Amino acid sequence: MKKHLLLVASGLLLSFGASAQTTSADDPLPGYTQAERFAGNKLSTMLFSTSVDPHWFKAGNCFWYEYKTGNGNVWYVVDPSAKTKRPLFDQDKLAAELTEIVKDPYTAQQLPIQKLETGEDGRTFTFQITSSQDAKKDSTDKDKKTKKEVFYFSYDYPTRKLTYLADKKKDTEYPNWASISPDGKTVVYAKDLNLYRMSREDYEKLKKDDKDSTVTEIQLTTTGVKDFGFGQPYSLLNTDTLCNGKRKNPGYLLWSPDSRHFVISISDNRKVKDLWVINAMATPRPTLETYKYQMPGEKEAPVSHLYLFDMSNDSYKEINTQAFKDQTIRMAYRPRLHKQRDMKELPSIWLGDNNRFFVTRSSRDLHRIDVCTYTIGEDSIRPIIEERMNTYIELRPLAAVNNGKELIHWSERDGWAHLYLYDDKGNLKNRITSGPWHVDQIVKVDEAKRVVYFLANGREKGENPYYEHLYRANLDGSGLQMVSAGDYFHDVRVDDNAQFIVHNYSRINTVPKSDLLDNTGRKVMELEESDFSQLFAAGYQFPEPFKVKAADGVTDLYGVMYKPFNFDSTAVLSYLQQSY
């Protein structure tokens, strides 16, 4: 099922109360005046948080979140096991303490807390406050622009004790050019179209001074050339500088879990013709940017190459991947955990174990896709799952079970998107899901209980088929169960232990709400309901969802109707139709 949505808008694309005036000679454009009340800059003062975005603690299943209403921002800590939600701060007390230290006046409703993070112990938080006063010049700061003074704090949640970190300096920022190995000992990066490595010690030196002459760089490759080099990301902005290797970048590689190897895919674009764009963001004037792009019908296509590097001796070799003309190679990666979201310098790790990883190989027309495996020591990748269709084939990320001994594969092979369980040899063990409905994506795999959680739509009768729900099923195909029930669109966050779920849900004509669920869908506690009070006070009314038949008289089309401000149900109105 393709996610196409018909949007019908009658007149102006905002809806509010019947108090709108009718057109008159004295006021020829009342609709525009009324519409201005709902312009983007005005909405930000009437519409606040609409979902809960959890920051899970590094240990356990507690999380914190920030939520804004018409009364300001509040921070909460939730303990799902204890079914409690408590304010993180005594905000009146905190405002007074911050005012005394920073010397800027603060209120409980307006605390400018930045970069709030929790420590490993689950009780200590750190954050910073930017003062209204200019900071003192630092001779080590490369940026000579005037900056505001920043104050750093730690906060002990159980005791509500605030500590001013007077001696703390600005955190050394994580360079975006570094790809750090999982063991943290090696840093690999691309520069001048080739790959280099350095030790963690030298990397730390460069974080403090990027011109430190004592740093030792070891060059791993020498074959990189223009339009066929290592670390050439696709970009529409600053393409001449970025895509031709004049900046350091992380190389877009994936490490083995034991840090002994990494794999990288690069593209040979030398025969592909140039395309040009205007970089309107350049200063002081727009610039002409050039990059490689294959237009429809052109024979010259990018050619993908896959290389494996051995860090024990700094050697590398190309892996044979060839099967389709003008094919594309994509490397499968290990998903990151929710508890890692605020962590810096995270490695990118391949999907698999220390000696094996997975890639997908796609034909140019996307009618043929292979899921392939590669084992270190071999010369070629080996296809284990083949997808063939006469039409465009979509892809979703693989999910690995037990380091890749089993794979959960997403496929539309029977006309509907479903999940299939394979062993690592490519033998189908069983279907996990089936039927006339659409699995959209895997959310979480609980390997211990052999349960997969996934988003799907179109299964519940009488609902808009575009509304996604969270489901769970056993890997053997049994036990299918809807977890997030209700005639809404559901946005979920499943914790790393697959025990609790933050559940945000709404429709176009309802106020968004957020609950905490257990992994079976039972409500543990209510979290939030969005504050629409100021929006309603300004005259806002919800648009109306509707369903009509398509021209074939069979297909249902779902849309949303926004009525004009001075809506007259007896009048014949024109409408705007947007289809994607």
Set out the residue ranges of the language-model regions:
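Bacterial N-terminal signal peptides that target proteins for export
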Residues: 1-6
